[in-house]
Curated annotation (Swiss-Prot):
GO terms for molecular function: magnesium ion binding; nucleoside diphosphate phosphatase activity; ribonucleoside triphosphate phosphatase activity. Mg(2+) 1 binds at N90, D106, D110. Keywords: Hydrolase, Magnesium, Metal-binding. It comes from Ligilactobacillus salivarius (strain UCC118). Has nucleoside phosphatase activity towards nucleoside triphosphates and nucleoside diphosphates. It is an enzyme of class 3 (hydrolase). HAMAP family: Ntdp. Mg(2+) 2 binds at D108, D110, D123, E126. InterPro entries: DUF402 (IPR007295), FomD-like_sf (IPR035930), Ntdp-like (IPR050212), SA1684 (IPR016882). Coiled coil: none annotated. Its cofactor is Mg(2+). It catalyses: a ribonucleoside 5'-triphosphate + H2O = a ribonucleoside 5'-diphosphate + phosphate + H(+); a ribonucleoside 5'-diphosphate + H2O = a ribonucleoside 5'-phosphate + phosphate + H(+). This is Nucleoside triphosphate/diphosphate phosphatase.
Amino acid sequence: MMNISGPREGDFITIKSYKHDGSLHRTWRDTMVLKTSENALIGCNDHTLVTESDGRRWITREPALVYFHKHYWFNIVTMIRENGVSYYCNLASPAVLDKEALKYIDYDLDVKVFPNGEKRLLDVDEYEDHGNKWHYSADIDKILKHNVRVLVDWINNGKGPFSKEYVEIWYNRYLELSRQQ
């Protein structure tokens, strides 16, 4: 659960994604918290160290706003690139924030939105493979499919992270806070 007693604006947190079987999938270091509320967390990272489950490490190439909500089974990464804004949306459990990190279960399916507005549903085969391997329940399947529809509605209607204003407001806030560090 995310709330005011957690990190404050300008604090840095780690983000950890897990798979359904409990194994660590990926870790992002140093995401700056821009806003927390009872239901959501907005953050930003730039040139952040990412560690894969197999130990490989890489650095992100561009600033990315992140959006997590405790009631939705997706999170949204807004990548701010020279050729425009693109989005990578993970179908995932609602995030949990503890002293160690913000954590969620990644359920394989992703929606990518390109700067021209084109949308692609990715990793359907991986979702089916992992669903069989780890026995995703019918309830989880139903929840995830419903959340794909919610996500597409947000995309099509420019809601929340998909609005131009959101990107401007939160990226500018990140730049302000970065100058104060």
